[in-house]
A protein has these predicted regions:
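Conserved nucleotide-sugar donor-interacting segment of glycosyltransferase catalytic cores
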Residues: 98-163
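Donor-nucleotide binding loops and adjacent catalytic segments primarily
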Residues: 29, 193-269
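C-terminal amphipathic helix plus adjacent low-complexity
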Residues: 326-367
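A donor-sugar binding/catalytic signature common to diverse glycosyltransferases
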Residues: 113-117, 259-302
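Nucleotide-activated donor-dependent transferases that construct or modify glycoconjugates
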Residues: 2-18
């Protein structure tokens, strides 16, 4: 339903833990803006404005300071446990004061509603300021914290503040696929939130018979150097990593001039790690995925099963991939095709947020 004359202000807080939280939220905001073309948007995140412009357009106010950090990482797949624990000790040393400071920021901005993917301090601040708020994500930092750091002496007190902050929201919209969330008492399950890319292979340079792969490990550097990447006859690789100048078969994905979701839909294979954005965009396009298994990551079981249900997918180790990439690709391409996914969660989340902007949403029962 359109509300063309009702200009509402939405505050969107995004975890800067890689690019996935911002990427998965963008199609929801696009769906919301179709309902509310006059929506005023503020995005609070430490992510670069240039990336946000690619996903959200330029019509928003950017607040680049946010207390949330998610987890400190050694690489795209390895958590720095000690640095993460220290980060949370500092964040919670005066959590009440931190929340009050963020609440004052919200009071000054006067948004009609807050959406968080998935900074919990922002949710606690919204509750403190009396502003309706909702969480949206496939993970939450309370259960992530307990999984990786729950044995630390300070963990019980920190986890309790995280849990209470999440539970202060009107609901936690858990996007499919998602981790189990035993800490969260207000979960509402929704469908997949993602953008379906458009296959634009005919716009890309090079001979039509050439094979094109995308190597993308998200917004956090991977410990895999592209200088070690195997050279395969007939293949060119678009990479989000640094491209070695001596390799004529590797180029930056940005040189191809396509939005990331369109590039995902245009390649022959994606090489990646388990991550909501890349997995779901691949599942919506049916593009085969070769990925580095991540058994310690709590999202992985659900994401792996979902991906295998919607496209050909094969989990490998870095050593297997670098040792015999051609054989791994042959195995991947021999798997049966699957039915591509649908992104039903975009409109489901937009409908919930639209009602939240009108303060028509009450506290939701756990699903």
């Amino acid at each position: 339903m359109l509300h063309p004359s009702a200009s509402k202000h939405l505050w969107l807080a995004l975890s800067p833990h890689g690019y996935g939280h911002a990427a998965m939220t963008a199609p929801v905001i696009q769906a919301l803006r179709r309902r509310r073309p006059e929506l005023r948007l503020t995005i609070q995140t430490a992510l670069p404005r240039s990336f946000l412009d690619e996903r959200y357009g330029s019509d928003f106010v950017h607040v680049p300071e946010i207390p949330d950090f998610g987890l400190k990482m050694l690489s795209a797949t390895n958590v720095d446990l000690d640095a993460s624990a220290e980060g949370y000790r500092r964040l919670h040393a005066d959590f009440i004061g931190l929340v009050e400071g963020e609440a004052a920021r919200l009071r000054d901005a006067r948004p009609d509603a807050v959406v968080a993917n998935v900074p919990y301090a922002t949710l606690a601040a919204a509750a403190r300021a009396g502003i309706p708020a909702v969480a949206l994500s496939s993970l939450n930092w309370a259960d992530m914290y307990r999984h990786y750091l729950g044995d630390r002496p300070e963990a019980a007190a920190i986890w309790a503040e995280m849990r209470d902050a999440y539970d202060s929201a009107r609901a936690f919209l858990r996007a499919t696929p998602a981790m189990e969330m035993p800490s969260i008492g207000n979960v509402v399950d929704i469908g997949t939130v993602a953008r379906r890319g458009r296959n634009r292979r005919d716009e890309l340079p090079g001979p039509a018979a050439a094979r094109l792969g995308l190597v993308a490990f998200g917004g956090i550097d991977h410990d895999l150097s592209m200088a070690r990447w195997p050279r395969l006859e007939g293949w060119t690789w678009a990479s989000a990593q640094d491209c070695p100048p001596e390799r004529d078969d590797i180029l930056s994905w940005r040189e191809l001039g396509l939005p990331f979701a369109d590039l995902v839909a245009s390649v022959d294979v994606i090489v990646t790690k388990p991550g909501y954005g890349t997995f779901t965009e691949a599942g919506l396009s049916g593009v085969p995925v070769l990925y580095v298994a991540r058994p310690d990551w709590p999202e992985s079981p659900a994401m792996d099963l979902w991906l295998m249900a919607h496209t050909r997918a094969l989990a490998v180790t870095v050593e297997e991939m670098l040792g015999d990439l051609e054989s791994q690709l042959r195995t991947l391409f021999s798997l049966p095709s699957q039915d591509v996914a649908q992104a039903m969660g975009n409109e489901e989340a937009a409908e919930f947020i639209d009602r939240l902007l009108l303060a028509e949403v009450g506290t939701c029962e756990s699903s």
